[in-house]
Amino acid sequence: MSGSAAKVISIARGEVGTHEKREGGHWVNDSKYNRWFGRIPGYGQDGYGYPWCAVFVAWVADKAGVPSLYPKTAGCSTAVNWHKSKGRWSAYPAVGAQVFYGSGGGAHTEIVYAYDATYVYTIGGNTNTNGSAEGDGVYLRQRARRDAYLYGYGLPAFPEGVVTADPALKGKQGFTYKATASAPAGSEAPKPKYEPFPGADFFRKAPRNAIVTAMGKRLVAEGCSAYKDGPGPQWTEADRKSYAKWQRKLGYSGADADGWPGKSSWDKLHVPNV
């Protein structure tokens, strides 16, 4: 690992694909990051149902061992003021920076992992990539640098210094100017312990491979077997019926428990990486 920025980005990337709780057909903001941060009175889900994009950033910083370099808050506006009060604010991106969106930066926040002349590349919590108003998880995003919605950047005081596109910081101690910057070495996410969701279409094509076998064994272990001969590598109707049992065990019903795997239920099944 080459530095704190790389560690932050690696931790954040490892969370891509994590989702908040879903209830009654809607995402309800209750995430593992909220549970780490704590209750906020007045919100649903027993105080855990609040927007969590800023909390995600604080959680990542904590897990990366640099909690003092990012604000620990659930409020984006509070986080903006935190960076500004430390003189760590810029209109230009930086690797590992906390980017803010909306009026005064109060609408949303993410972590920058790379940038070029046109785009900033980020990892964000409580967002999505489908255009829905309901943010539901952690995603990789690409944002236009000159989009009016983008407000600015907080620059953490990394011990190794900050790589930034801000020309005003060129030559200043603690900063390295780069017009474009890739993600730092060592910032790759670790190989997942569990098999990533292969996509809904994967199963509808009746695949035959080790993923299907591993899934079937986990369904049996969860008491959700509809198999007569035991799970095997070929996707069959027995797999679909077994998976429907798993969906019902999770509380899904109707079309949400039709036996076709979805990402949320798949992630909870913890199929070993094959």
Describe these PLM feature segments.
Residues W27-G38, G42-P51, K86-W89, F202-N209, ...:
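A glycine-rich, coil/turn loop motif that links secondary-structure elements
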Residues K245, K249-V274:
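Extracellular LysM carbohydrate-binding repeats and other cell-envelope/extracellular binding modules
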Residues M1-A64, Q173-P198:
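N-terminal capping segments
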Residues A12-E23, A61-S68, G124, L219-A226, ...:
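Sec/Tat-exported extracytoplasmic proteins
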Residues G3, G87-R88, T109-E188:
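Aromatic- and glycine-rich peptidoglycan recognition patches
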Residues V66-N130, K263, D267, N273:
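...with weaker cross-activation on analogous glycine-rich loops/strands in unrelated enzymes
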Residues S4-I11, C53-F56, V60, Y92, ...:
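Stable alpha-helical elements in mature extracytoplasmic
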Residues A179-P233, A238:
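Acidic, Ser/Thr/Pro/Gly-enriched interdomain connector segments
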